[in-house]
Amino acid sequence: MIGSSHAVVALGLFTLYGHSAAAPAIGASNSQTIVTNGTSFALNGDNVSYRFHVNSSTGDLISDHFGGVVSGTIPSPVEPAVNGWVGMPGRIRREFPDQGRGDFRIPAVRIRESAGYTVSDLQYVSHEVIEGKYALPGLPATFGDAQDATTLVVHLYDNYSSVAADLSYSIFPKYDAIVRSVNVTNQGPGNITIEALASISIDFPYEDLDMVSLRGDWAREANVQRSKVQYGVQGFGSSTGYSSHLHNPFLAIVDPATTESQGEAWGFNLVYTGSFSAQVEKGSQGFTRALLGFNPDQLSWNLGPGETLTSPECVAVYSDKGLGSVSRKFHRLYRNHLMKSKFATSDRPVLLNSWEGVYFDYNQSSIETLAEESAALGVHLFVMDDGWFGDKYPRVSDNAGLGDWMPNPARFPDGLTPVVQDITNLTVNGTESTKLRFGIWVEPEMVNPNSTLYHEHPEWALHAGPYPRTERRNQLVLNLALPAVQDFIIDFMTNLLQDTGISYVKWDNNRGIHETPSPSTDHQYMLGLYRVFDTLTTRFPDVLWEGCASGGGRFDAGMLQYVPQIWTSDNTDAIDRITIQFGTSLAYPPSAMGAHLSAVPNAQTGRTVPFTFRAHVAMMGGSFGLELDPATVEGDEIVPELLALAEKVNPIILNGDLYRLRLPQDSQWPAALFVSQDGAQAVLFYFQVQPNVNHAVPWVRLQGLDPKADYTVDGDQTYSGATLMNLGLQYSFDTEYGSKVVFLERQ
């Protein structure tokens, strides 16, 4: 917890270049979402205040406060001394720090003029308040009407370079969320180059702070990393062309004493799928600056006269109740104001994916047999994975066929239509008339050199002039910056989905981007990809789309605009998945996680974990499925029971609030609780990863319940919410890998 001396500072800094001034009074309460008083601005949420003002002498925007609720007049800071090399701009908290005028910290924007200058002097011109939250051109964005959000746009202008910048601040008060983005427009006669652009820059007052991020690699995504913010620059990002497995575009700044359920935390999440940068700098004066936006190494964006570059959005969420509270605010906001799919909050079908069951080795007869066995298990959706396409270059391994999206005639002599019809005529076991649904795997952004498409259009693959085209997994990346490539993907996907009965698409992407012709290609690629997704998801709203980038490589808020679920990791080992899924939930709702029960020994780790444990871990994702050959399932008698349990918990997983009760990095007994929005139901997932010999299993205290209500636990004993939260529950486990799913219902 922050002590009282820190709390005074946190009330806000009101600083002018060269002198201090009395802070303006902006209303006596937070009754209005956005309040302006001349050139002072207040954004007010249920539990958050965001304040800044214009320096009347310089036109610069000065940060006053981002944190807990403040009202009325806020105190002025002590006037900073100006000594040494650091000028006044480097000694204050700035809203949109530019470069070249004495602030030696990381800038939010760096512009190179045609003459070579990189100095900017963006000054306040005007502002406007807009009801609701508007879309961004060509980019995914949060949305909301006048009841949900209010937007402040501050217009800046550089009189020397004729560059304009529009800073957008949208507040969703119910979620204590501020959403920021920037438009930079060249209003001059010559070309300019945007070398760096952050969607958000926050200068925190002097305090000791920690930073939290998600690091990893393929099959090892979303490991939580926490470290002390040191003097100097620290940070992370992606240069892979995508948000990537390596680092996720999520950052939290927290008080050192902050835990899951206590303390101040600020969460930042970029609504973007491309290369990004997240940087934190503690400057010489002790202020901490946090920036998220484009990766400057992969931008270099040319703007001709009249042209505009729009940054991705960054969502900033505040809570004084720990990281768990920040996560729940992200989850609610994204479910209601980012994810556009009709499936975002609706029950997901239990699925079986063919990949780990048969890999590339199948034909029409064997795939129909696999579907029949799936329906007999009680599965509702059968997904045919990689290996169904390619004529001259059949897809019988990963070294050929990508780009040739027609059924392999050797495997499907009559095409896919009769296969889909046969499978969707199967009745799901345990139902009277529910028919099995059919889904399919595609990897539209990729091409194998061994393909007809590549032989006809080698220029469509990303390449840098004469340099060799580096293959990964025997494939190259199509250049989605090209409209012709975008149209090709839209057209073949339309032909595949139109009138075929396919109701689910798994969209894969199994490598990073290499050999781009220019740094700006990365963002051009993303704009093309977003156009493709926007077109297809609008054209086929009844198709359930799943994003998959070799598992986890594009698990980001940008993708969630178009797809309601994402394959969380190619690692399906249940022990590893607990860590991956808990980490992913720092920013992203469990409803968006694809999680499957796979065969053992696990293909990635070689570990053997009990069937029930694997199932319980997978149930914590919004899309539960099986990734195995049904004929090899052990313990057939428990499969219908577990599938029924998965269907029972799914509505609470999709729309409930997640409480991470005990973290896998801290305990051998990780636990999570999901509480329905109305508080009437809850489901506890409790695991034992490794027992301690001759040691009691610890009690687990629940959270998020009504302390005055009574709850029935698994239809048996009844306890008060206060008892369950202050004392908790205790269970014993008979095996090394033990698990329990416990239902609670409010009386």
UniProtKB/Swiss-Prot annotation:
First-tier enzyme category under EC: hydrolase
EC numbers, comma separated: 3.2.1.22
InterPro entries associated with the record: Aldolase_TIM, Alpga-gal_N_sf, Alpha-glycosidase_related, Glyco_hydro_27/36_CS, Glyco_hydro_36, Glyco_hydro_36_C, Glyco_hydro_36_N, Glyco_hydro_b
Reaction(s) catalysed by this chain's protein: Hydrolysis of terminal, non-reducing alpha-D-galactose residues in alpha-D-galactosides, including galactose oligosaccharides, galactomannans and galactolipids
SUPFAM superfamilies membership: (Trans)glycosidases (SSF51445)
Disulfide bonds: none
Positions bearing carbohydrate: N37, N47, N55, N159, N183, N191, N363, N425, N429, N450
Cofactor(s) needed for function: Mg(2+); NAD(+)
UniProt KW keywords: Glycoprotein, Glycosidase, Hydrolase, Magnesium, NAD, Signal
Signal peptide as annotated in the record: 1-22
Lineage top rank: taxon: Eukaryota
Pfam families membership: Glyco_hydro_36C (PF16874), Glyco_hydro_36N (PF16875), Melibiase (PF02065)
Recorded GO MF terms: alpha-galactosidase activity
Family according to the record: Belongs to the glycosyl hydrolase 36 family.
Stated role: Involved in galactomannan degradation.
Record text on subunit structure and interactions: Homotetramer.
Record's protein name: Alpha-galactosidase C
Protein encoded by which gene: aglC
